[in-house]
Amino acid sequence: MGKDLVAASATPLVLAILAEGDSYGYAIIKRVAELSGGHLQWTDGMLYPVLHRLERQGHVAAKWSASENGRRRKYYRITREGRAQLAAQRQQWQAVDGTLRGIWMKACTA
């Protein structure tokens, strides 16, 4: 998958995953791979800049907490503002999807 498409889809993917429940970096990376059927293989270097930007924008909040094995992890949760942003992103992506489907149907039947 192209870098531009991966970058463009990062925000709605992270927000949608956090809308399922609080999570931490490694679990988010695994969830992206799972949801994409392995087509998207994110790294720490891809995810953490997105999380930090979303945190600065107030779309996610973070807190340190102990995991089951006692190690500290930074957990992220979506905020009210993040849910509003997710709804806006969803509308935008649905418009793009509808446009592409329409043009592809015409192109395939021409």
Residue ranges and their predicted role:
Residues 84-110:
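Amphipathic alpha-helical dimerization/coiled-coil segments
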Residues 55-72, 77:
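Beta-hairpin "wing" of winged helix-turn-helix
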Residues 47-54:
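Basic amphipathic alpha-helical segments that dock to polyanions
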Residues 3-4, 51, 110:
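Short, contiguous hydrophobic alpha-helices characteristic of membrane insertion segments
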Residues 2-46:
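N-terminal helix-turn-helix DNA-binding core of bacterial DNA-binding proteins
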